[in-house]
Amino acid sequence: ISGLKLDFESREELKKYRLNDFCIGASVYSSIADFNREYLLDLKNYKKEVRDFLVTSARIYLSFKNYLSKRKTDIVYLFNGRHALEKPVIASCKASEVKFFTHEFAYNGGYDLFENTQPQDHEYRYESIEKVWRNSKFSDTKKIKIGSLFYQQNLGRQQGNISLKINQENIEIVKNKYEALDKLKTKKVLPDSWVPEKENIVWFPSSEFEDYTAPEFCNDKTIYSSQIEAIKKIIRDTNKHSDKHWFFIRLHPTYSLFHTKVQEQNQYESLQEEFKNVTLIYPESEHCSYFLMENANKVLAFRSTAGIEAAYRKKPVIMLNKHIIYKLNSVYAPKNHNEVLNLILDPTLKPLDNRDAIKYGYFCLMSGILPKYYKRDLKRSYEEGWGLFKDTRVTPSYLIEKIVLPLSNRRKLSSVRHFINKLHHKI
């Protein structure tokens, strides 16, 4: 790796950088974007991290490619696949024509497998919805009951944090302890600016940075180049035709749990200065998102699960990104800006049939594979180590927990690791 490029002048230069057929720059960008949920990185702040990730990622790619060339391998399994330490494994498998599966948390407490692709592949997920519904052993009546539970128990934000038990008679869903979400308190109240005589539209934007972490699958922005551009253009043009519309932009409550303010929040805050008919609902607000959508005249979303949750509740939903939910028949799927405006300005717009919403709910609860011997301790959160193997708690050994981990955080050892990394750069 002596010829590996380590310094970059711009984000685009880094994202386009490749090692043979491996998009190493994009995978490094994806990992660093996770640090502070940034979609527009200032590379000057991450020079060391960029170099460290590039070196490590290149070593994994070349080493694993060499491993596959010397050993017959049937299948490779790995987690997620978009980060700098996982993507090189996928690149090695593709170069060696070896079958691979990525795995990710499933809604139902199990895990999902993705054959020769990643969890971010929304085309793969969309095709799986109908397959899971069609291949189910349950009657349509029971499938509808299971799919409806996803919405009736507000499980949209509980991904990977429920335990599901289904038998011939009963369906039991238990929400696991979830330290982050359990801190969020909500109230069923509407904002002071909510006027019943107005056309009240609730907008659920998604995190921008996620669109930059798996660029090969982020091909769903067919109408607008960014969410903030879409919001400004839609509100500006709506106001040219009507003074009856009021937009409530609900920033995701989990933003309040991050250690830094999400990068795009400043842009959202400026909307209230630019437009008089906008109310920004902050992440830390106690306004219940479900109560907002239940009272809305219309709901807008890009790729948020809130879109399909509102569709189940028989609300007219307009999806703006060509993502999984956009393709379901329970939501409106405009193809251009004029179609978006016509839907927003239509005072008689009706909700669509929610059968596809039910299929989506069923898919979320039933697509995950439940392990045979592993389950969750319902009284423990992920952060507390919720794993039970054959009913025995899975914990690090005393040596790891009491000696290795504390020592690894000491400054002297950190300096040693930094020195070793420098040697690696020179090799």
Please provide the spans of the model-predicted regions.
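Conserved N-terminal ligand/cofactor-binding loop architecture of enzyme catalytic domains
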Residues: 1-58, 105-181, 374, 378-391, ...
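Conserved nucleotide-sugar donor-interacting segment of glycosyltransferase catalytic cores
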Residues: 60-116
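Structural alpha-helical scaffold elements that stabilize or flank donor/cofactor-binding regions
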Residues: 67-69, 194, 291-295
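A donor-sugar binding/catalytic signature common to diverse glycosyltransferases
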Residues: 85, 111, 284-332
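Hydrophobic beta-strand scaffold residues
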Residues: 98-107, 247, 280, 317
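Conserved catalytic-core segment of nucleotide-activated headgroup transferases in glycan assembly
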Residues: 160-269
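Nucleotide-activated donor-binding/catalytic signature segment of Leloir-type glycosyltransferases, i.e.
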Residues: 265-283
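Nucleotide-sugar donor-binding patch of glycosyltransferase catalytic domains
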Residues: 316-362, 366
